[in-house]
Swiss-Prot record:
Keyword terms, alphabetized: ATP-binding, Ligase, Mitochondrion, Nucleotide-binding, Protein biosynthesis, Transit peptide
Location in the cell: Mitochondrion
Name by which UniProt lists this protein: Glutamyl-tRNA(Gln) amidotransferase subunit B, mitochondrial
HAMAP family associated with the record: GatB (MF_00121)
Organism, as annotated: Talaromyces stipitatus (strain ATCC 10500 / CBS 375.48 / QM 6759 / NRRL 1006)
Cited InterPro entries: Asn/Gln-tRNA_amidoTrfase_suB/E, Asn/Gln-tRNA_Trfase_suB/E_cat, Asn/Gln_amidotransferase, Asn/Gln_tRNA_amidoTrase-B-like, GatB, GatB_Yqey_C_2, Gln-tRNA_amidoTrfase_suB_CS, Gln_synth/guanido_kin_cat_dom
Range of the transit peptide: 1-114
Record region (Disordered): 59-78
Catalytic reactions of this protein: L-glutamyl-tRNA(Gln) + L-glutamine + ATP + H2O = L-glutaminyl-tRNA(Gln) + L-glutamate + ADP + phosphate + H(+)
Length: 595
């Protein structure tokens, strides 16, 4: 986020923190040998050196899973029927869209050379102290406002103690006791993909949102080493904690998907699950519906079964599949007379079972304590009000606008426009629509009614298919919005046929720089419509050659076969002269007329 934008509000925010007591020299040569640490492991299994892309890994695991099911080796899923109630709570960790780290002046970057953006505090050097970077608060506040949270005037930072190689200080700075936002909620609708049993709408409450620092990134180097990249240490995160109010795996996945969409719409984050910028932990418990309330208590909700936590889920499908697997495991344990243990479990792509990682830690194990080096965080109401007034349009509002009278889209077309390419596809579509509106400004309102649907069809399906076929990422400059709008305009005005429009689209996509009008004239593609007599003559010749099909249409009412005749007229007629709609009108008149 540009620094000039947020500097206007820092004075009113009244954010206070203890300044650094030592000078931080980024990348000091005398410390470079400490920036990359090698962790030896006991693993003796040889693994391939090539890094397998995540998408390829997902495809391979899906194929293997299908093969196992066909051969009868797949997991027998335990039906989550009326006997059992599933309860799920979610904790989402999202990297904030910030140029600065949370507690040091080192810049954030996901693509920089390993260990090149590291401050002394990031490595926990003796004497270094945290210096809260006020700019990191702005994307967090936008997220909190968009998720309907109550922003707290005062919040504080705590230390969460644990030892692992990716956390050099031996503790993580978070906001366990007094987070900066509480009591939010998110609304999920049937079009978000919630489970059918949840109906058309479900509300999930958000207990709290808290700021915390990220850990180092571990790179595995087989057979027995891990390299640590400390660029990610102290990258600002928000942790979003939902209440345990979710009762189906599909709704849990929909919840994570919707939260990610909201965070991206508000520019609170730069990347989502697909690039590792968002991770989810799920807490899963089951209980018999006809049994007395369970002994489990979770964020004030009593009567639950014993929960387990599944860590670091990195895709929406992983969220759903991991919950299904853990639900079924717990049901099997309870039905066999066992007890569900309090533990943290893991999940691997393509797996059919969760696996135990460790016994789950609690508040006592983490030894939460206030951070003595950080003052309370004071957030001014004026800052919150300003951010709320300038909040971007959220996904639900965009959908309502697209299916409304202005654009008139179906929900099936509106959702991809909102979800694809981090909003770039929607922005491109709106540019195309605006140009079309200007080109048809003199038309009656009835004539303009279909412009939105026509533009969506070409942006989503025709142009989208070309990108998919070419295996290239979406790029608006490939065919400028003005160019596509002019092409669609020629089609709407019936100066070209649909097949010619698609042909021209391919030519422009492959690099033809000529203006649309010039291209159509030079390639002799403009429609020279047939007169009525020419349409009738062409149609009659086809009718005479295919009497059996004509009889089927007339006697058996197989009207779909008229489309075959239309296609033949377009192919047999002179290129660019047969208009499909006019051809169908003539065919219906000739075939269906009464003798």
């Amino acid at each position: 986020m540009p620094r000039l934008w947020y500097s206007r509000y820092l004075a009113s925010a009244r954010l206070r923190c203890r300044p650094l007591l030592i000078s931080e020299q980024y990348g000091a040569r005398i410390y470079q040998h400490l920036l990359r640490r090698t962790i030896n492991t006991e693993a003796n299994v040889q693994r391939p050196n090539d890094i397998v892309p995540l998408r390829k890994q997902l495809k391979e695991e899906a194929k293997r899973s299908k093969s196992q099911s066909r051969n009868g080796r797949g997991k027998k899923q335990v039906a989550a029927n009326n006997e059992w109630e599933l309860t799920v709570g979610i904790e989402i960790h999202a990297q904030l869209n910030s140029e600065a780290k949370l507690f040091s002046r080192a810049p954030t970057s996901t693509v920089a050379e390993p260990n090149s953006n590291v401050a002394l505090f990031d490595l926990a050097f003796p004497g270094s102290q945290p210096e809260f970077q006020a700019a990191t608060l702005l994307p967090a506040l936008r997220a909190a406002i968009a998720l309907n949270c109550e922003v707290q005037h005062t919040s504080r930072f705590d230390r969460k103690h644990y030892f692992y190689q990716d956390q050099p200080a031996g503790y993580q700075i978070t906001q366990y006791y007094e987070p900066f936002a509480r009591n939010g909620f998110i609304k999920l609708y049937d079009y978000d993909g919630i489970a059918p049993e949840d109906g058309k709408f479900v509300r999930i409450d958000i207990k709290q949102m808290q700021l915390e620092q990220d850990t180092a990134k571990s790179h595995e180097h087989p057979p027995s080493a891990h390299f640590l990249d400390f660029n990610r240490v102290s990258h600002p995160l928000i942790e979003i904690i939902t209440m345990p109010q979710i009762h189906s795996p599909a709704t849990a996945a929909a919840c994570v998907r919707k939260i990610q969409a909201i965070l991206q719409a508000t520019s609170a984050v730069t990347t989502g699950m697909e690039l590792g910028g968002l991770r989810a932990d799920v807490n899963v418990s089951v209980r018999r519906r006809d049994a007395p309330p369970g002994a489990g208590e979770y964020y004030g909700v009593r009567g639950l079964g014993q929960r387990t936590e599944i860590k670091n889920l990195s895709s929406f499908k992983a969220v759903e599949d991991a919950i299904i697997a853990e639900r079924d495991r717990q049901i099997r344990v309870l039905e066999s007379g066992g007890t569900v243990e309090v533990e943290t479990r893991g999940w691997s792509i393509g797996s059919t079972e969760t696996r135990k990682l460790r016994s789950k830690e609690g508040e006592v194990d983490y030894r939460y304590m206030p951070d003595p080096d950080l003052h309370p965080l004071f957030i001014d109401d004026g800052l919150v009000s300003t951010l709320k007034e300038n909040l971007p349009t959220l996904p639900d509002q965009l959908l309502a606008m697209l299916v409304g009278p202005m654009y008139g889209l179906s929900l099936e077309d509106a959702k991809p426009l909102v979800e694809l390419d981090d909003g770039a596809r929607l922005e491109y579509y709106q540019d195309v629509f605006d140009v079309l509106q200007a080109l048809h400004s003199d038309d009656r309102d009835a004539a303009k009614k279909g412009l939105g649907r026509t533009a969506a069809n070409w942006v989503l399906h025709e142009l989208g298919a070309l990108h998919t076929k070419a295996e290239v990422a979406w790029h608006a400059d490939r065919i400028p919005a003005q160019t596509l709008a002019e092409l669609i305009d020629q089609l709407i005005r019936k100066k070209i046929t649909s097949s010619v429009a698609k042909q021209v689209l391919v030519m422009v996509f492959e690099g033809d720089q000529r203006p649309i009008q010039q291209l159509l004239e030079e390639e002799n593609l403009l429609l020279r419509p047939l007169c009525r007599e020419e349409y009738i003559a062409l149609a009659n010749s086809l009718i005479e050659e295919n009497p059996q099909m004509v009889a089927q249409i007339r006697e058996k009412n197989q009207l779909g076969k008229i489309g075959w005749f239309v296609g033949q007229m377009v192919r047999q007629g002179e290129k660019g002269r047969v208009e499909a709609q006019r051809a169908e009108e003539i065919l219906r008149e000739l075939i269906l007329k009464r003798n």
